Amino acid sequence: MTKTSAKNSSSSTVQSPRVAIAIMAAGKGTRLKSRHPKVLHEVGGKPILAHVIATAAKVVPPKDIFVIIGHEAERVRAAVGASGVQFVVQAEQRGTGHALMVARNALAPYDQVMVLSGDAPMITAQTIQKLSAFHSAQKAAMTLLSADFNDPSGYGRVIRKSAKSAEVRAIVEEKATSRQQKNIREINSGFYVFSIPALYGHIGELTTDNAHREYYITDMAAVLVRAKQKVVVMKTPHAAEVLGSNRRSEIVDLDARLRLAKCQQLMDEGVTIFYPQTCVIDSDVEIGTDTVIEPFVQLRGKTKIGADCRIRSYCVINNTEIGDGVVVLPGCVMDDSHIANDAIVGPYSRLRPGSEIGEGAHLGNFVETKKTKLGKGSKANHLTYLGDTEIGEGVNVGAGTITCNYDGVHKHKTVIEDGVFVGSDATLVAPVRIGRGSYIAAASCITEDVPADSLALGRARQMVKEGWAREKRRQK
């Protein structure tokens, strides 16, 4: 390339604007009647605000996301701080317009800021990106996102300059609408894009001439229109994206919508979910292809399930990793555990944190494990408690076996080596080690280590008194 052509190429390049995202998360949420910040109420298995941040991070890097916090600021910061976003503290909550005043120093280096509601978790990255692109194409000072609601009551109405115009004349709040304006179904969603020079060149013109004596971001539309600045609107066809969470009923509705959307996503990826409306599957759950989820299953947290599994009804699985080809029978409860390929668990098994079930192993009905490793091909099929236990491969643990791991002060470990056969109703008092290939007789209480290939018995010798019962009956 010649110097001349290089120069022409450079001069024709349009530099992309520096874009920030500001997330409004300072409010209390009075209508929820809650002791907790509104944005920390959970939908889809995580705080509302966490959903909004995750979406924003698909559009700009976390360093360019500014979460404006106020009410219970430190709790909100602690809940979502690991996401790497920036925080701006609105110490005195004097409205949404005031929040942007407080964020002025943080946002000043940017060309454009997208303002998101911290209580609207269904907004998508695609819609945010379209809104930003529309704002740039229109060369607007302010762009707002709207939607058509069948029942727009309670929302501000968007008043356009004309029916076919993208330009906005005003945003009229519900209480100020005329009878004719109340029939307008196009509502202001609370999502905006601002040109930074226009925003901070005119934000000082906001007033508190309202019932709550606050600065409202919606008033920026009228301020900019008066200043002959261009204010436009983009309507999303997906009205559910802008739903907020001001009431408990709205939180419940959002949770249901997010979970059904998650089920649909998984089914599109090759998972079968029967009666998805009965299942609770959190946003971060991953499931492999050809796995079947039966009705009334809860999959929580960061649970990850492999391919070709079957999760039967009424299981509650939290932060657990499950391999391929695993069958989980009805009624199992699992927390922070790991199940290897081709294992069978349940029915009614309880896996507490730190449980590891090996490849092809069986954990049966009414078996509880905690900080326990069950080796490849081993079985504990009935009525058993295994705590702080390491079990090798090919072990059979008989019905009613208990590891006594707690002495009232400390926990102790039980080790059962490969190929051991533990008879029913055995009591293993930790710390204890059962050597490779040994047998433990049924009903034994084992308090000492057992060498490899041994038989251990720890019970009283059976005594039979013939005729004793007949004599006892004669005494009546």
Show which residues each predicted segment covers.
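Glycine-rich hexapeptide-repeat left-handed beta-helix
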Residues: A6, S11, V327-K476
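Conserved alpha/beta core of the MobA/IspD/sugar-nucleotide pyrophosphorylase nucleotidyltransferase superfamily
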Residues: P17, R185-G288
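Catalytic metal- and UDP-sugar-binding loop of GT-A-like glycosyltransferases, i.e.
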Residues: V43, L116, A456
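Acidic, glycine-rich loop-and-beta core segments that form the ion-binding/anion-interacting portion
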Residues: I281, E286-S355, E359
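Glycine-rich N-terminal loop/short-helix segment of MobA-like nucleotidyltransferase
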Residues: V19-V43, V59-V60, V80
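Conserved core of the sugar-phosphate nucleotidyltransferase
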Residues: E74, S83, I123-A211, T218, ...
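Structural beta-sheet core signal
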Residues: I21-I23, V67, M114-V115, M142-L145, ...
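Conserved N-terminal catalytic core of the sugar/cofactor nucleotidyltransferase
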Residues: T2-A20, K46-A133, A137
